Amino acid sequence: MRRPDENEYGAPYRRYVDLVPETDIVSALDVQAAVIERWPARVSHEKETWAYAEEKWTPRQVVGHLSDVERVFCYRALRMSRRDATPLPGFDETPYVAASDYANVPLQMLVAELVALRRANLPLFRRLDERSWSATGQASGMTVSVRAIAYVMVGHVRHHVNALEERYALTMD
């Protein structure tokens, strides 16, 4: 499989796609699930409930946010791979996290949920043919391909892993 061309996604997604050098995106999705599964052993209880600044998310909230994004983006990939031309709305992650109870859920439970979501999504991506990978649709007012969505899913997790490592002094990989 090839990487998505820049015309397959909007500029806001470039930073995520750029974090994914792999060409076998299904393998990258799969391997990432195994890496995510090890996170709870790498984060102390004190760190999982700590935010590095006011109005910033705790590691628990970050992982909850990753589950929200996993759900939204896989739904987009499903709709587009089935040639559904209905424009899909964007979503604002800040009110999603604010409306959740992620801050009160142990990291281990949140990670288990994220891993379960990713593993449930993998069969969809494994079955896609080239026509489905190349299918496009509208989401958040931008044209995006199914292929780009998969790359964004992996890159988005990597983006947050980088932030957890830099701002929380955690070793996630």
PLM region descriptions:
Residues 28-39, 95-134, 153:
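Acidic/histidine-rich alpha-helical segments that form the ligand environment
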Residues 11-27:
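Short, charged, low-complexity loops and linkers
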Residues 1-8, 12-15, 48-93, 119-123, ...:
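Short, contiguous alpha-helical
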Residues 22-30, 56, 60-63, 107-111, ...:
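Amphipathic, non-membrane alpha-helical segments in soluble helical-bundle scaffolds
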Residues 29-57:
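A glycine-rich, hydrophobic loop/mini-helix early in the fold
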Residues 17-21, 58, 99-106, 141-145:
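Short amphipathic alpha-helical segments at helix-loop
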Residues 17-21, 33, 44, 81, ...:
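Generic secondary-structure transition motif, activating predominantly at the C-termini of alpha-helices
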